[in-house]
Amino acid sequence: MKNPFEAMKQLKKLQEKMAKIEEELEQTLVEGTAGGGVVKIVMTAKEEVKEVKIDPEVVNKDEVDILEDLIAAALRDALTKAKEKSAEKMGSLTDGLPLPPGLF
């Protein structure tokens, strides 16, 4: 069996990497768009919405339902991108560790 102190050192390194990745995810911005850029949502890779931008040209009180659909689509797009960034960064966390496949 491996030296328990070595395992503790690896765990500490893993925790340090995790903290660094969490910080990077908080700073990484992604942008989701819909309607050809008419609606934009900017969020962190930790899925915190920072901005919602709507082109004033498309604001029409008679077509609020279309605008609502565009906002929802932009949010879904931004969430997908945030999750992809998060998975990408988290994948690098376990590189070189003897873990079973699919654990993270």
Swiss-Prot record:
- Claim: Nucleotidyltransferase is one of the keywords in the record: no
Q: Which family does it belong to?
A: Belongs to the YbaB/EbfC family.
State the name under which the record lists this protein.
Nucleoid-associated protein Dtur_0258
Q: Where in the cell is it found?
A: Cytoplasm, Nucleoid
Q: Output the Pfam families linked to this UniProt entry.
A: YbaB_DNA_bd
Which GO cellular component terms are attached? bacterial nucleoid; cytosol
InterPro entries per the UniProt record, alphabetical? YbaB-like_sf, YbaB/EbfC
- SUPFAM superfamilies associated with the record: YbaB-like
Where in this protein does the record put region Disordered? 84-104
Its subunit composition reads: Homodimer.
